[in-house]
Amino acid sequence: MAQIKVDASSPVATLIGDVVGSREFPDRRKLHRRVAAALAAVADDAVDAPRLTVGDEFQGTYPTVGRAIDAALTLRLSLAPDIDIRFGIGWGDVAKLDDASGIQDGPGWWAAREAIEWTAATQQHSGSSLVRTAFRNRTGAGTQPHAVNAALMCRDHLLGSLDERSLRILTGLRAGQSKKELAMTEGISASAVSQRANRTGVDLILLAAQELREVP
């Protein structure tokens, strides 16, 4: 039996994610490389950098729930629309079972597992098919999940309703590009970018992301 090594003296936000419909990808090696590259880009804010564990699943830990939510959004946008990811976030203590694989255990990990299983089940229903992120906290302390999950469900619905151009605009704005720069890239006017960002909810998603990032 593996010896459990405790890495943190205080609760953390565990992030678990996996690829939706991964078996349908014809080139699994390419899929693995793209996900691994996306994970490397969200490692800086992590307590334990997210990495692939078993199959197309990955896990990591962040100091706050907000940082984990923000990392999940960055991952989703960096892989969309070709690769769809679902997430579970859990708050609580965690322990690493194995340093080589990065596999974790403990209340925080169990909460994240519960969250991603709920996400997978919920997206099977027509009214909630665009849900991709959920949060659980069974510690009795820290951020409570109800308001966070309400915000995540609404944000995910907006995000899942975007077409490819709107996704590119959202991704560019989050990366710090101006609407004028994005207009040149897209071959449309800056006014058209602004109108699209307003009409499709891109501006609202950006505001929500700023608020959610600050969740403790």
Where would I find each of the regions flagged by the language model?
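Regulatory and interdomain segments flanking nucleotide-handling catalytic cores
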Residues: 1-216
